[in-house]
């Protein structure tokens, strides 16, 4: 399904194009990346959690600075549709807390 929109990895031209902007394949060794909080869910059927784990691990391994690279795994959750309001509020609170902490914003 994705090949129609993005191209097929079996076509060399498509493959080279995909790799050129792949978030995973464009992580540079030793670059000073900003603080990152990657969100995934254990039952996501659109973005397989393994992709988020691999991206986070690669970013951690190649990080040249000291900023944290973290992954947050939502339990019993999917891609977002039908998520309870309580869970949405908690996720937003976590994201804002991480962002404010990393920016040094006091309260």
Feature roles, as predicted:
Residues 1-107:
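Active-site-proximal cap/loop segments of hydrolase catalytic domains
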């Amino acid at each position: 399904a994705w090949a129609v929109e993005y191209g097929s990895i079996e076509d060399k031209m498509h493959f080279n194009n995909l790799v050129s902007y792949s978030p995973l394949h464009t992580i540079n060794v030793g670059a000073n990346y900003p603080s990152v909080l990657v969100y995934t869910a254990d039952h996501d059927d659109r973005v397989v959690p393994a992709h988020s784990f691999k991206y986070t691990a690669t970013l951690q391994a190649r990080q040249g600075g000291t900023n944290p690279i973290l992954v947050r795994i939502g339990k019993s959750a999917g891609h977002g549709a039908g998520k309870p309001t309580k869970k949405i509020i908690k996720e937003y609170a976590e994201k804002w807390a991480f962002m404010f902490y990393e920016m040094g914003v006091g309260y």
